[in-house]
Structure formats: structure tokens, C-alpha cells
Amino acid sequence: MTQARPYAGVEAADRLAGRRARLLCAGLELLGSTVDPAELTVRGVCQEAGVATRYFYESFPDKDEFVGAVFDWVIAQLAATTQAAVAAALPGERNRAGLAHIVHSIQRDPRLGRLVFGDQVANAAVVRKRQESEAFFAMLSGRHVGAILQRPTNARINAVSHFVVGGVTRTISAWLSGGIDLDSVELVDQLSAIVNGFGEPRLFRD
């Protein structure tokens, strides 16, 4: 098998990773704007990324896989930074720290809010990925609750975790669309008060 030679001192694998990263960034730029994913084209994505069209298919088999990869990439970064914010907070402030980080992240970069929480996106790939991300954050929430209560995650913890994550998601979505007239600090205060209200241990007893 012939090995790919370095080009301008950059190995082939690094060039591929660089092109993929540029395509993902272009995807966030386009999907986080007012463009409906149904209107995305491979040519448009590559033009935004500044790469030749042929390079799209070395990383993604089709447009739906690309949209899913952009969403996964965004969620992975948001989850990692949110977990870091929670870990750095005092025990009694961890719910607020996580919520504040999410709200302030989408306030700093509105593209994140439109992609992850926006009502205007009806693309099937995005809808599926949102469902997956809610399940993922519910799992993280359940682990957090289980650690606080010092007990294994059970069905009641799972039920509350899904309820809280779904409620927070819909509330942020309504806030972004202008349906909730609160500033970001007030929103975090309100969400924190609601989430903290689910800290009653009796809710989680079998």
C-alpha cells in the first residue's frame, strides 16, 4: 500500500482532520443562522469552509450525516464545558453553575442556541439529534443526582432527570423565541429555583 506523502510538511491524516474541522465550523455557521437544513447544499457548505467539493465526501457520506456530525460536535463541546463548570462549583451551587454556563454559552454564541434549542429547525436529522442529546443530558443529570444521594440511579431518578432536562430545554427554547420576557440572569435564577425544587429525596425513593 502506498503511503500518502506529507504536503507542505503536513501529514495526510492531519490535512484530513483540518478539512473536517473546517467543514464542521462551516456547518455550525450555516445551521446556526436562519438557513433551514433542508436548504443546505454540499456546494454551499464547502464554499463556506473554503474547501473543494470533493473533500466533503472524504469525511461525510451524505448531507444528513454531516448535519448529525455538526450537532454531535457542538453537543460534545457544550457537555464538556458544562460538566467542567459544574465540577468547579461548590456543592450547593452546581445546578446553577451548569444552567448558567448553558445560558451564557448560547448568549455569547447565538448559533449554538439556534441549532440546539431553536424552534425554527424542523430537519429530521436535527430533531433526532436533539432527542438523543436530551437523553444524554438526562443520563448525566441522573448520575449527578445519584452521586448526591449516594445511591445507584433508579427509575425514579431517571423519570425526574428526563422531566427536568425536557423542561429546561423547552424553557430555553421559549426564551430564545421571545416567549419568556426575562434577561439571562433572571432566566438562570428561575431555572435554578425550579431544578433545585426537585432535590427532595422522597422523590427518588423506591
Language model: regions and residue ranges:
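Helix-turn-helix
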Residues: 33-65, 69
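Membrane-embedded alpha-helical bundles of multi-pass transporters/translocases
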Residues: 53, 75, 199-201
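C-terminal peripheral helix-coil segments that are non-catalytic and often amphipathic
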Residues: 1-4, 143, 171-206
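Short, amphipathic alpha-helix enriched in basic
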Residues: 17-43
